């Protein structure tokens, strides 16, 4: 069965036990940690070369998902603009949010949650609309967006890299992502696909951004030059081990496991900056890594909670490949393995984010 990423990469829907709404705690921590960076980028829109104050600020949230994540991002933007306009003594502009994700995203649950923002900012004139589509292509009219924001989305690839021998045999058998045992071709394939896809994200956003527009991108990344370092690959190695167990139990076909690779890449800061420089549409105003400790005694020290956090974003793509009927068994086994790893100190202990703030270059023209 051919895998069309645009049809299956989305977060778990609804508001049930395994939904993204109930399990997006890690992403919220990333948003909180990066809030000052986003706030500064938003407020820089009011200190540029605009001949007249902005009357409408258009904001795009790429890969917005659902639940508290997009609502918190919207709140940060609104509060940043309110604060800056208060400082400058200027009239508060209207704010238009363009909430983008693939068509499979649960936009209904997303829109239901907007009442929280509505109640919180009754005196602010803001609007929200859905913008379904892939950020690997064009989404918005030329020169229309003042701010493009994305948190934990653009590390998803447009497709999994093709990792086979000349004879068409899988080279990453028993794994679903890079690992210590993967041959060099696997690492090269993933990096090449990331470079192609991230370049397309930049290339398609450039004409859409207004002059002096900003783009804030937050990606799940890595600090190490080694893309198979434990904190990076632990999740996918854990799930591959659980899937291998299901193969041994006759619950899934080994060929399905051997032929599957997740369309996901954890870049280093250097890899991100290299693509930005080569693509050439933006200047980098800020670039850094943000580290969250997820080991030890914290909210993720419970194996069950941690597995729910993994399941809420990985289940849709895994169920498409291996079947919905084995998902409970898969994540139960993963929790069992994780609990044992906790005892031995083998689990991942850090979550790494790459944060960049980009400004559209002023010398570009679009015809």
Curated annotation (Swiss-Prot):
It catalyses: 7-methylxanthine + S-adenosyl-L-methionine = theobromine + S-adenosyl-L-homocysteine + H(+). It comes from the Eukaryota. Pathway: Alkaloid biosynthesis. Mg(2+) binds at residues 172, 258, 260-261. One of its GO terms (molecular function) is metal ion binding. The record marks 149, 220, 264, 324 as: Involved in substrate discrimination. S-adenosyl-L-homocysteine binds at residues 20, 64, 69, 101-102, 134-135. Keywords: Magnesium, Metal-binding, Methyltransferase, Transferase. The keyword Kinase does not apply. Coiled coil: none annotated. Binds 1 Mg(2+) ion per subunit. Theobromine binds at residues 27, 152, 155-156, 313. Its cofactor is Mg(2+). Pfam families: Methyltransf_7. Involved in the biosynthesis of theobromine. Belongs to the methyltransferase superfamily. Type-7 methyltransferase family. This is Probable 7-methylxanthine methyltransferase 2.
